[in-house]
Amino acid sequence: MSEEKPQQSAEEPEPGEPKAKPAPEEPEPGEPKAKPAPEEPEPGEPKAKPAPEKTSDYYRISEKLPVRFNNPGWFHGYGTKEAVSMYRTSNQTYGSRAPTVHEMPKVFYPSSNKFSRQHAAFGMFQSHNINVTLEKSLVTGPDNHITHYDRLNFHPSYNVNRPSICD
């Protein structure tokens, strides 16, 4: 007595193997294609969060770029209560959301603080001269000086005895 295993058809998988999905039927010409149903994870499995986007995933970045600029997810917008759309300005919209990878800097140029250190040690330049110069008028030219005693001499056409025409 020999026991024979029943032959499995080519369509049935081995025990323990997942069942193969049937081939989608081709729609008739002129009919829209049906979208495949998204595969949902099994109820027991938690959904894995996607890794946060990095600027380096989309752009070539400088080697000297600080880490915070490669991770825009670290920044948060300054969200506030929604303003009435009639009164909303573009400035309010700009600061209310976190930046995307496309808005982050790709290159970083650090600046020296040599200027600030020098002024912290010695202070700003101060002129101790006495202010005795006369003001030169841009209206009358460099030859005419406006002084404290001749304030009405600001333009050659200002003369009550003659018409107001420049000589």
Swiss-Prot record:
Task: Give the observed phenotype of the deletion mutant.
Answer: Mutant mice exhibit severe laterality defects, including situs inversus totalis and heterotaxy with randomized situs and left and right isomerisms. They show partial embryonic lethality associated with heterotaxia. The motility of tracheal cilia in adult mice is also affected. At 8 dpc, they have a reduced beat frequency of nodal cilia. 50% of tracheal cilia axonemes have missing dynein arms. Double PIERCE1 and PIERCE2 mutants show high levels of embryonic and pre-weaning lethality. The few mice that survive birth display hydrocephalus and laterality abnormalities, dying by 20 days of age.
Renumbered to this chain, the Basic and acidic residues biased-composition regions fall at 16-54
Chief localisation class? cytoplasm
Between which residues do disulfide bridges form? none
Q: Output the superkingdom of the source species.
A: Eukaryota
Record keyword Ligase present: no
Sorted UniProt keywords: Cell projection, Cilium, Cytoplasm, Cytoskeleton, Flagellum
Q: Coiled-coil region(s) at which residues?
A: none
This chain's function reads: Microtubule inner protein involved in the attachment of outer dynein arms (ODAs) to dynein-decorated doublet microtubules (DMTs) in cilia axoneme. Functions at the initial step of left-right asymmetry specification of the visceral organs.
Complex formation: Microtubule inner protein component of sperm flagellar doublet microtubules. Interacts with CFAP53, ODAD1 and ODAD3; the interactions link the outer dynein arms docking complex (ODA-DC) to the internal microtubule inner proteins (MIP) in cilium axoneme.
State the protein's name. Piercer of microtubule wall 1 protein
Classification from the root reads: Eukaryota, Metazoa, Chordata, Craniata, Vertebrata
